[in-house]
From Swiss-Prot:
Variant histone H2A which may replace conventional H2A in a subset of nucleosomes. Nucleosomes wrap and compact DNA into chromatin, limiting DNA accessibility to the cellular machineries which require DNA as a template. Histones thereby play a central role in transcription regulation, DNA repair, DNA replication and chromosomal stability. DNA accessibility is regulated via a complex set of post-translational modifications of histones, also called histone code, and nucleosome remodeling. The lineage of its organism: Eukaryota, Viridiplantae, Streptophyta, Embryophyta, Tracheophyta. GO terms for biological process: detection of temperature stimulus; negative regulation of DNA-templated transcription; regulation of gene expression; response to osmotic stress. It comes from the Eukaryota. It is found in: Nucleus; Chromosome. This is Histone H2A variant 1.
Length: 136
């Protein structure tokens, strides 16, 4: 009987040990979840490392801060664009709504000076072109 049953006993012990290890092991938490933001902190950190001129040296909190800024700006633009689309009674945000939202806000306009494809132009009529009715 030597050799019979011994292997099963060892296998049972290792399985029990693995279950104990699984209990002790914590589920990995992403840096985005730790910071409480939706934008990917790890991906932004990798992009910062490849683009920085300091030989890939980027602080750990720099990526969290950058992701937070990007998330805030995105939420701000989407909120204003959603308001613009709601004013026009449309359910889908288009580049036109983004253009109206960005150009309507003074701070976002100075931050985003580039052209938005398909955004059109901002409606504006110069004061001198408006027909003035005078009572005489």
């Amino acid at each position: 009987m030597a050799g019979k049953g011994g292997k099963g006993l060892v296998a049972a012990k290792t399985m029990a040990a693995n279950k104990d290890k699984d209990k002790d092991k914590k589920k990995p938490i992403s840096r985005s979840a730790r910071a409480g933001i939706q934008f990917p902190v790890g991906r932004i950190h990798r992009q910062l490392k490849t683009r920085v001129s300091a030989h890939g040296r980027v602080g750990a909190t720099a990526a969290v801060y950058t992701a937070s800024i990007l998330e805030y700006l995105t939420a701000e633009v989407l909120e204003l664009a959603g308001n613009a689309s709601k004013d026009l009674k449309v359910k889908r945000i288009t580049p036109r709504h983004l253009q109206l939202a960005i150009r309507g806000d003074e701070e976002l306009d100075t931050l985003i000076k580039g052209t938005i494809a398909g955004g059109g132009v901002i409606p504006h009529i110069h004061k001198s072109l408006i027909n003035k009715t005078t009572k005489e």
